[in-house]
């Protein structure tokens, strides 16, 4: 009976082996690679290794192992063997990439509203009247069998069936690739049910068949303001990438008509919202006519998120808020780009190695950006205004009047004096040479001010000149011009009113003798040969406490002693007499503790300058250098004691400074902890619930709720909300993981 190998009779006793031989025989002699996993799926109960082994046996035999009783069936021209061979060559060899495609996880797909909720189920293999099987008999060489999709519209109580070729459905709607790309399902019947709006899915099927022969005479479906949102959500769920891009572009061009149409904009997920917002500039969003605020606030919220993205190139802002912080000294909001351009208090001025003045800000550890944004929203009542205020906080310009860099929110803070400064002549007063006074506010000023800080009693708008315009006078081509143009358009929201700060802005407003910014100390008889009445190069400024603290480290005072003022190794009585005289000259200094003296070095410096003897009338800088030198005329024991006293004084000051820094951090942490609610998490949740309800609604419903809901139930209400929110959080984390 067998025309091939002797084991063929054993194979023919099993129908699965016969089907495997019918599949493998047409593949003999084909150079292409065979996907054995796909072949094993076609025949139940076989593994890929068994298929490879049987294929090698068939190649060694060289003829078909099927018995003669099946020859009449295989000899027919349109028999199932030739049809099967055609199918194997087209699917197992040409379309191997489809089987290696990564399946789509249905659980991770977001389902918004009632659109495009698809389910698949396997029909019974014994059913002979399945619709999908009847439709699948009309197969094409390129598009495969037709698939029937049952659409159920619960809102309109409608049901309709749509027919689409399998390959076309997979290529356009990639959501169905998981269920229709496996060839083993060709042997079973597949039924697809979609819960969606019938008219929307009809539009989608027409779009899928736009390039087929049947649709040449049909009109291509067009997007409209009334259906684009539903089509966008459905196409994004079905993974129709080209249609999603078309819908996003259409939304960008026709957003005014879309928000005016009766459509639900809340179904748009975060990914689609981000892609739509990236196409808009902030001026385009600001020009949207959204009376009901259906979508504009969401776009501005997404723009705010983009301002905090350090990796995103923002065409609307040359700076980002990723490094935003607040200085605990000047209370200004700064970023890494603006911290060295914006001035701090005069005590934090420094000079770099190139001679340029730089500013050193100290980060406020208690400031939180989330609390700042929430406070801005409570103040401005609109996310649009919050965006523009934040945009003005991180962008800066340079004024051509005061030559100072300023934040856009400080556009109206250009300080100036209404009258010209008047300098006194040397004949009138020797003590005021090089200083002047503004008659408008009686503020004293140096002729040559090393701080270069512009102060004034009045404020006005800054003036910015554009020097980098293009050849065609396109002023908006440079970033500075764009920032200035946006600042002028939204000045009412961005600019904040000027508030006088006595710490950082002491020169604004009326100045009396007590509130002067500088305390000028003139030393006519300087030891380095200056003329009478000439200013010292190291002028002592009132607010420059940093220099005074540095000089105090080199000054030698009597309160820092080790108790060995007079030693046994001292030679001569003149030293003991001079020490006793110096001790009698300053008897009051030992009454104050050293800590208080360390805390106020400025006041000590003023007292010490008055108590200096005539023999020590030189500059404090020169004195400090002389006092810390090794005195060869003194004994070794005296110099060692002086060195130990100096080391002890320095360590005391360092310890006090470290303690002050540590206590400062603790105070900031305690201040942050004091902001927390005393009642814990439940009181905070209660405050959030009350804050989320509008004021008018709370006032209207306060009388009803007061009589119906007792106060003792408030804890249970907040507790139930807390448990519900915790369950939602755990569920979301489970899907994320």
UniProtKB/Swiss-Prot annotation:
Q: Where is this region: Disordered?
A: 555-618
Q: Which domain of life is it from?
A: Eukaryota
Q: Which GO terms describe its molecular function?
A: identical protein binding
What's any GO biological process attached to this entry? isotype switching
| Bias-annotated ranges (Acidic residues) | 555-576
Q: Where is the composition biased (Basic residues)?
A: 580-595
Q: Subunit info?
A: Homodimer. Interacts (via the BTB domain) with HDAC1 and NCOR2.
Q: Which family does it belong to?
A: Belongs to the KIAA1841 family.
Relay the domain remarks. Answer: The BTB domain is important for homodimerization and for its function in negative regulation of class switch recombination.
UniProt-recorded name of the protein: SANT and BTB domain regulator of class switch recombination
Which organism does this sequence originate in?
A: Rattus norvegicus
């Amino acid at each position: 009976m067998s025309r091939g190998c002797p084991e063929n009779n054993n194979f023919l006793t099993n129908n699965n082996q016969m089907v495997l031989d019918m599949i493998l025989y047409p593949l003999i002699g084909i150079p292409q690679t065979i996907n054995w996993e796909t072949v094993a799926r076609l025949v139940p109960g076989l593994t890929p290794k068994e298929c490879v082994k049987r294929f090698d046996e068939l190649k060694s035999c060289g003829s078909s192992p099927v018995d003669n009783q099946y020859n009449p069936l295989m000899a027919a021209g349109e028999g199932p063997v030739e049809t099967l061979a055609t199918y194997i060559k087209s699917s197992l060899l040409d379309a191997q990439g489809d089987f290696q495609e990564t399946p789509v996880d249905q659980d991770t797909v977001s389902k918004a509203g009632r659109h495009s909720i698809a389910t698949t189920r396997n029909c019974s293999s014994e059913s002979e009247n399945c619709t999908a099987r009847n439709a699948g008999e009309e197969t094409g060489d390129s598009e495969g069998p037709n698939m029937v999709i049952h659409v159920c519209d619960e809102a309109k109580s409608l049901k309709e069936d749509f027919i689409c070729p399998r390959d076309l459905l997979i290529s356009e709607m990639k959501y169905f690739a998981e269920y229709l790309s496996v060839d083993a399902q060709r042997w079973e019947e597949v039924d697809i049910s979609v819960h969606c709006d019938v008219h929307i899915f009809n539009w989608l099927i027409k779009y899928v068949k736009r390039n087929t022969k049947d649709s040449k005479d049909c009109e291509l479906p067009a997007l409209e303001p009334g259906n684009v949102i539903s089509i966008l959500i459905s196409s994004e769920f079905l993974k129709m990438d080209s249609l999603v891009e078309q819908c996003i572009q259409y939304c960008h061009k026709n957003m005014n008509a879309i928000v005016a149409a009766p459509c639900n904009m809340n179904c748009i997920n975060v990914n689609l919202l981000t892609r739509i917002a990236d196409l808009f500039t902030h001026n385009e969003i600001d020009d949207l006519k959204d009376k009901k605020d259906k979508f504009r606030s969401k776009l501005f919220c997404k723009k705010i998120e983009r301002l905090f993205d350090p990796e995103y190139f923002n065409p609307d802002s040359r700076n980002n808020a990723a490094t935003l912080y607040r200085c605990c000294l000047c209370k200004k909001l700064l970023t890494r780009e603006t911290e060295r351009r914006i001035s701090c208090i005069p005590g934090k001025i420094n000079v770099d190695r190139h001679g340029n003045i730089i500013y050193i800000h100290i980060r406020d550890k208690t400031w939180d950006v989330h609390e700042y944004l929430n406070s801005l929203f409570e103040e401005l009542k609109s996310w649009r205004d919050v965006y523009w205020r934040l945009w003005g906080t991180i962008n800066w310009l340079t004024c051509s009047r005061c030559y100072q860099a300023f934040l856009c929110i400080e556009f109206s803070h250009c300080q100036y004096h209404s009258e010209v400064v008047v300098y006194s002549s040397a004949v009138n007063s020797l003590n005021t040479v090089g200083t002047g006074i503004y008659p408008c506010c009686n503020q004293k000023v140096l002729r040559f001010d090393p701080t270069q800080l512009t102060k004034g009693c009045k404020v006005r708008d800054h003036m910015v000149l554009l020097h980098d315009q293009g050849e065609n006078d396109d002023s908006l081509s440079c970033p500075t011009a764009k920032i200035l143009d946006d600042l002028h358009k939204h000045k009412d929201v961005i600019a904040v009113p000027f508030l006088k700060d006595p710490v950082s802005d002491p020169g604004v407003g009326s100045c009396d003798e007590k509130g002067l910014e500088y305390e000028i100390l003139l030393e006519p008889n300087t030891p380095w040969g200056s003329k009478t009445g000439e200013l010292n190069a190291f002028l002592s400024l009132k607010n420059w406490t940093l220099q005074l603290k540095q000089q105090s480290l080199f000054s030698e005072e009597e309160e820092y002693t080790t108790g060995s003022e007079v030693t046994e190794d001292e030679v001569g009585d003149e030293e003991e007499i001079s020490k006793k005289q110096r001790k009698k000259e300053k008897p009051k200094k030992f009454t104050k503790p050293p800590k208080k003296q360390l805390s106020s070095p400025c006041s000590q410096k003023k007292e010490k300058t008055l108590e200096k003897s005539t023999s020590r009338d030189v500059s404090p800088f020169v004195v400090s250098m002389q006092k810390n030198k090794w005195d060869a005329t003194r004994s070794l024991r005296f110099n060692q004691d002086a060195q130990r006293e100096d080391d002890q004084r320095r360590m005391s000051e360092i310890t006090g400074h470290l303690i002050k820094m540590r206590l400062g951090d603790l105070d900031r942490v305690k201040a942050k902890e004091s902001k927390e609610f005393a009642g814990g998490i439940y009181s905070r949740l209660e405050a959030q619930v009350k804050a989320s309800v509008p004021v008018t609604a709370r006032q209207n419903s306060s009388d009803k709720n007061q009589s119906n809901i007792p106060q003792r139930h408030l804890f249970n209400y907040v507790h139930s909300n807390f448990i519900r929110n915790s369950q939602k959080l755990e569920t979301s984390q489970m899907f994320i993981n």
